């Protein structure tokens, strides 16, 4: 999901903000690529600049223009794919495939048709597994630390930049 208006950040195109030298959306797609058969990126008029990445650097990513707000765009995306479907926001620069794999295993065993990933300290992060297009939901709580940082404010972005700097200082590059 990459269609948000980023009102808390003055309307910046968040998916294109760089963290560790590359746009956040590139980092997210790179980390989920091996977990998904098909990746669809839903964008909006506000975030239409991400289309340039869909045509090249992100590889086999289908870009679809959303129809409005988050709920409408989510419905659009879910109608384009077979289920189960994993929904991931474009503004989680450190998303970890190991955490996602653990979440998916737990979510698939959960009886509810919609399962949300919730970080123990940050709360809901916007990652959801849809086994059906609607219905009751459950939460899977994990302690993801910085790997589940969801950039919603400039303060979050500054934290991401700090984390990246700290990672580089110790000589460990994420990815």
Each language-model region and where it sits:
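N-terminal glycine-rich phosphate-binding loop and ensuing alpha1 helix
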Residues: 1-48, 98-101
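Short, structured coil segments at secondary-structure junctions
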Residues: 12, 35, 57-59, 81
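Conserved beta-strand termini and adjacent loop/short-helix elements that scaffold enzyme active sites
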Residues: 42-44, 64-67, 117, 141-143
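Conserved beta-loop-beta/alpha segment of the NTase-like Rossmann-fold superfamily
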Residues: 51, 59-125
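Conserved core of the sugar-phosphate nucleotidyltransferase
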Residues: 93-175
